[in-house]
């Protein structure tokens, strides 16, 4: 939330390690910009900066707020064509809203990602004030659409473990949003119910900020 494609680039410090390991990093923006939708910049947790990696169905957002289609059907294929990367070894990870996106997109597009991980993700968006606000705005009262973009609900509906190689989630215990917005325990329970291996690592003293992100 509130971030751009530059936030991770300038604050996370991941480039050095990625260069050492031969990993290409792709940092997409978090929402459309410059669309001129009325009210798009009135709130920090909705509209600009809060795309939530979904395709909106409610007007006036439906035309431009199509982040899932942009990422999965435009940006990733274009990246694979333009750069010498191994498309069979693409992983996805994200922080907070980006963690929500990593988990939901990976489940909504089975087999697309070789690894899936998240840092302090919004893991049960329907239970979070952030998620309720965004889903109401982008989907209206279509609860079925809400459920299709809630990581815990999606996991609970899996007939078999979708990621047999396992999932990795890091979460700071001093995170001010942990109990109200993030709900990692709900996602962990959903994983347990479908026997999805997940490694949920809690870290004392770490909050929701970029010191946490740059550490793990």
Write out the residue ranges for each language-model feature:
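Non-catalytic cap/lid and distal C-terminal segments of serine-dependent acyl enzymes
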Residues: 1-216
């Amino acid at each position: 939330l509130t971030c751009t494609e530059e936030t991770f680039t300038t604050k996370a410090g991941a480039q050095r390690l990625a260069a050492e390991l031969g990993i290409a990093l792709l940092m997409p923006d978090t929402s459309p910009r410059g669309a001129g939708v009325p009210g798009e910049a009135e709130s920090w947790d909705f509209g600009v900066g809060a795309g939530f990696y979904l395709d909106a169905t409610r007007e006036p957002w439906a035309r431009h707020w199509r982040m899932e289609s942009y990422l999965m059907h435009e940006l990733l294929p274009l990246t694979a064509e333009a750069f010498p990367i191994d498309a069979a070894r693409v992983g996805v990870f994200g922080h907070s809203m980006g963690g929500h996106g990593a988990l939901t997109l990976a489940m909504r597009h089975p087999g697309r990602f070789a690894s899936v991980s998240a840092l302090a993700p919004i893991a049960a968006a329907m239970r979070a004030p952030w998620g309720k606000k965004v889903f109401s705005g982008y989907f209206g009262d279509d609860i079925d659409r809400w459920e299709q973009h809630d990581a815990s609900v999606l996991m609970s509906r899996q007939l078999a473990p979708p990621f047999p190689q396992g999932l990795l989630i890091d979460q700071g215990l001093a995170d001010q949003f942990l109990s109200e917005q993030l709900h990692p325990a709900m996602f962990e329970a959903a994983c347990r119910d479908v026997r999805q291996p997940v490694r949920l690592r809690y870290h004392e003293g770490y909050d929701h900020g970029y010191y946490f992100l740059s550490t793990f």
